[in-house]
Amino acid sequence: MTEALKLPVGIEDFAEIRQAGFYYVDKTKFIEQLLDGWGKVNLFTRPRRFGKTLNMSMLRYFFEIGADASLFDGLQIAKNKKLCEEYQGKYPVIFLSFKNVEGLTFADAQYRLAELIAGEAERFAFLAQSDKLTENEQSLYCGLTAVREGRYALADEVLVSALQLLSKLLSKHYGQKTIILLDEYDVPLDKAFQNGYYKEMVSLIRGMLGQALKTNEFLQFAVLTGCLRVSKESIFTGLNNFKVLSITDNRFDEQFGFTDAEVEQLLAAYNLTDHLEETKAWYDGYRFGDADVYCPWDVINHVDVLRSNPSAKPQAYWINTSGNALVKLFIEMADKSTRDELERLVAGEAIEKHIRLELTYDEIDSSIDNLWSVLFTTGYLTQKGVTEDGAYKLVIPNQEIREVYKLQIQEWFKKKVFADTEQLQSFWQAFAMGDSGAVELFLNRTLSNSISVFDAKGRDEERENSYHMLLVGLLAGKADWLVRSNVEAGEGFADIIVETDDLDDGVIVELKYAQTMTAMEKSCAKALAQIRTKRYADYLHNNGREKVLLYGIAFCKKRCRVVAEKL
């Protein structure tokens, strides 16, 4: 029964999922669409963790000669008997995932690629004695898998043609053209750019793909997946039969990621339908073509946790497996205009931008406009429509990704504020003395120069908490002060209590969020009255601190009002 099915957390092999009884969201319609919309070379670009590798594995097991046809029993593709009879198990298949092709040097990465191709070639050990091959061809195969001193010995000059050669040998053995599947094709380029050997890797990948995909008479068709559509002039020069299916294309728009119906069915299978709303808020919102989809990695992980703990809160699963360097770079490069746009995004608004879907890695950080494009293609932004002049209406897709931006903005903000030690020292001195005017001036200047996450969509309590975190961070930077947050004191919980380096002194802070600027004064008075009524000062008095300073601070957007009193 469905209830007994395990969830495939981190499993990307189609056969393992089907044979070991894991829950599988049926994406086999992808096969039918691929054959109906025929393309000699097909590139699918999607963000990471959207099921690209699993779909490629599925293609391998469907088309490959000798694969277990029963893996597809009961799945949608099995209903198309004519297609299955014509294509299933009829082709040799080369399947490579480039996700681990990396290294600090070009030589390291080059060997990882050679290792990958040699490992795939070893699956076809029968080629070494195939009577369909000449002795020279058998020798060429042995060259692909040769090992010397514990390392694959694939020569550098052979590496460029290795894919084409393997497809030729397989085709001659089987009397059938070869299908080539290349997963995460752009990872080697990304890693090369990060480590300073981009030109060398571009040359290698361009040569390899050119021979395997452009002038290869032994190719049936090829499918590539990746995050970025790398410029055709950079990698895919001369590929006239090249079809790109990006996140803006309505073809295959439901084949990567989970649809609403698929998520509802998954939750129902584990009696978790009451978690649909939170799952949607955190992990839905990606727009691929005409489809709205969820990140499958997030959904699978969330449901897996909920099975053992139904009260578990959503977590940022995708964030934890993907670097957020792009968002960090974007924030650091942002000018005042871009920071304003970023604030609007975090607040839930849409920003209109023209997007370049085709870039080279060395162009990514050359302009802020290019970064907008990369954030869109990698899933940190999505679109909810296109203007008449072709600009995309960009939004943050969901709560999980909003948390990425908020975290990176807060890190940037903290770094920026703490860089000005003189201003900070003045703020701390004014705060300890009860100089409300100086404290207010510092906070207003700080807020005006920030990227606001302090007024994003949410309840007043949530907004107040954002300002609370800001102030705690500023005060905690004073090493010889003890700063406590949400402290049980008197007849309630004080927002912030500070025990300064003067053993007789202490400070109590109560924060309020005001709906309007004019309401801030009353909010400050309300905060001070709450401190007195709830007797928060008892906490400090009990610790021998008799000189107590009270602060009522009200925030509204990027402004604040500060009132101080001595108890």
Which sequence ranges carry the predicted segments?
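Conserved P-loop NTPase mechanochemical-coupling segment
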Residues: 9-18, 108, 112-160, 188-193
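Substrate-engagement module of ASCE P-loop NTPases
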Residues: 121, 162-173, 200-220, 536-539
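Sensor-1/coupling segment of RecA-like P-loop NTPase cores
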Residues: 187, 197-238
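Extended alpha-helical interface modules used as scaffolds for assembling large macromolecular complexes
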Residues: 242, 294-535, 560-567
